């Protein structure tokens, strides 16, 4: 593994033109009473399968705003702000819920979006159906922001490293610093009671319909939020690309005892591995 010159890396990171950045911002749509919306995808955004900038994630109310990649930070923020404003103006009476943890649930299920009849879209639908059958709607109703970053070939060359070593190193460092990241920027300490109903959790009452965990910063990445006990028991390493790929293949191909109880014949999930796909 090639060591990266830390001084050079700091110099590169001080410039906003050495990397390509993009944002995927998830929001649940809610009605004005603070409940998860049951409306379909707004007509102004067209068919979600073919819209590169405004699409759906897990369910009908789970809206996702996607930017292209930019080198300049101000251009990225400007595009994201403009796209966000456009979305808010075309929600047909709904609002964008501004938190990672969802608003009040109306019923048992959240509507899955239609995906079409091609093999690709059928697989997308089956994958989300599998998530529902494995974990339930509540876990899939949490939202987040994905920050995507890649470095230019000139940077990789100047750092005297390889693309694989650079990105694996970034993953290792992120995991090492993850608790600090949550402590500094985590912002989801409260959950509605309808989200935690019938779950055995030690969590305090904040208001009549809200619960919180004292001194918490992010319920979304806790056992209460987007969490899988089956996946948590597995260990993914980022030491080498080959080791990483072999682990992913095993978690896809080796049947998981709990998920094997879900029917494959009735097309309720992609497979019975610990994870359904890459």
Walk through the language-model features, giving the residues of each.
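Terminal catalytic/cofactor-binding subdomain
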Residues: 1-132, 139-145, 165-172, 179
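Loop-rich catalytic cores of soluble enzymes, especially ATP-dependent carboxylate-amine ligases
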Residues: 105, 116-134, 141, 150-278
């Amino acid at each position: 593994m090639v060591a990266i010159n830390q001084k050079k890396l700091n110099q590169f990171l001080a410039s906003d033109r050495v990397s390509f950045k993009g944002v995927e911002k998830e929001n649940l749509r809610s009605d004005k009473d603070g409940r998860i919306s049951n409306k379909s995808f707004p007509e102004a955004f067209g068919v979600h399968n073919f819209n590169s900038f405004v699409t759906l994630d897990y369910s009908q109310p789970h809206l996702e705003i996607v930017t292209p990649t930019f080198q300049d930070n101000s251009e990225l923020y400007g595009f994201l702000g403009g796209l966000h404003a456009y979305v808010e103006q075309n929600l047909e009476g709904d609002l964008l819920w501004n938190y990672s943890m969802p608003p009040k649930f109306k019923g048992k299920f959240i509507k899955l979006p239609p995906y079409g009849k091609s093999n690709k879209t059928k697989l997308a639908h089956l994958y989300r159906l599998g998530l529902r059958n494995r974990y339930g709607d509540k876990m899939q109703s949490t939202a987040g922001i994905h920050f995507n970053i890649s470095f230019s070939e000139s940077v990789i060359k100047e750092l005297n490293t390889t693309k694989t070593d650079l990105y694996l190193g970034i993953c290792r460092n992120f995991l090492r610093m993850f608790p600090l990241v949550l402590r500094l920027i985590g912002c989801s300490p409260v959950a509605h009671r309808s989200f935690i109903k019938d779950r055995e959790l030690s969590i305090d009452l904040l208001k009549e319909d809200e619960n919180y965990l004292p001194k918490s910063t992010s319920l979304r990445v806790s056992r209460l939020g987007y969490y899988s006990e089956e996946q948590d028991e597995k260990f993914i390493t980022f030491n080498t690309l080959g080791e990483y790929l072999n682990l992913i293949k095993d978690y896809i191909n080796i049947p998981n005892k709990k998920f094997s109880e879900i029917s494959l014949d009735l097309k309720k999930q992609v497979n019975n591995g610990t994870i359904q796909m890459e």
